[in-house]
UniProtKB/Swiss-Prot annotation:
Gene Ontology biological process terms, A to Z: ribosomal small subunit biogenesis; translation
Disordered as annotated region, ranges: 1-49
Residues of the S4 RNA-binding domain: 94-154
A single cellular component GO annotation: small ribosomal subunit
Name used for this protein in its record: Small ribosomal subunit protein uS4
Subunit and partners: Part of the 30S ribosomal subunit. Contacts protein S5. The interaction surface between S4 and S5 is involved in control of translational fidelity.
CDD domains: S4
Length: 204
């Protein structure tokens, strides 16, 4: 098991929130951070602390992408026209592993990344094994034949707590079309995300 995968629920505990909305998150039983001092009452958080927390939560939600990747995505968002926070969300939602997750081809973001890495995902009929690959509007993302019978894919498609968002249009159980780049209020986050604070963090 990778370090990132084993730590996924540690992020839930640290944030005190069920980041991915999973029924088996330990936060459903306790809302304090990990470790023996997790239950201590916290004082008022500084502006920097709030900004850092917002960045850690958003970065963690997308499969704990590396700081280098996240900063590069932010830099691209800041060069685009319009609101930088909205641009950042749009770029993150265009990641191939995220579209695979949204399509319910994988039960978790981490599993979606694994499926892509192992060559089970096709974009417009071409095998693509780069999780961070940018999906464009109109692209068709499909499962390879072997993936259709994988237990984790079948598990993902049966999860009642997750719905496929409007900007990912399904065609059967093994194919979706990315129809548009979503805005913040269209993304089905189980918790509140604050990209404006992420912008403030990187603008210091």
């Amino acid at each position: 098991m990778s370090k990132r995968k084993s730590a996924k629920y540690k992020l839930d505990r640290r944030m005190g929130e069920n980041i991915w909305g999973r029924p088996n998150s330990p936060v459903n039983k306790r809302s304090y951070g990990p470790g023996q001092h997790g239950q201590r009452r916290k004082g008022k958080t500084s502006d920097f602390g709030l900004q850092l927390r917002a960045k850690q939560k958003l970065k963690g939600y997308y499969g704990d992408v590396t700081e280098k990747q996240f900063r590069r995505t932010y830099a691209e968002a800041s060069r685009m026209k319009g609101d930088t926070g909205q641009n950042l969300i749009g770029l993150l939602e265009q990641r191939l592993d995220m579209v695979v997750y949204r399509a319910k081809f994988a039960p978790t973001v981490f599993a979606a990344r694994q499926i892509v890495n192992h060559g089970h995902i096709y974009v417009n009929g071409v095998k693509t094994n780069i999780p961070s690959a940018r999906v464009k509007v109109g692209d068709v993302i499909s499962l390879g034949n072997k993936a259709k019978e994988m237990a984790l894919v079948i598990e993902a498609q049966s999860l009642p707590e997750r719905e496929i968002p409007d900007y990912v249009a399904p065609d059967g159980n093994d194919k979706v079309t990315f129809t548009r780049v979503p805005k913040l209020d269209e993304v089905p986050y189980p918790v509140t995300m604050e990209p404006n604070l992420v912008v403030e963090f990187y603008s210091r």
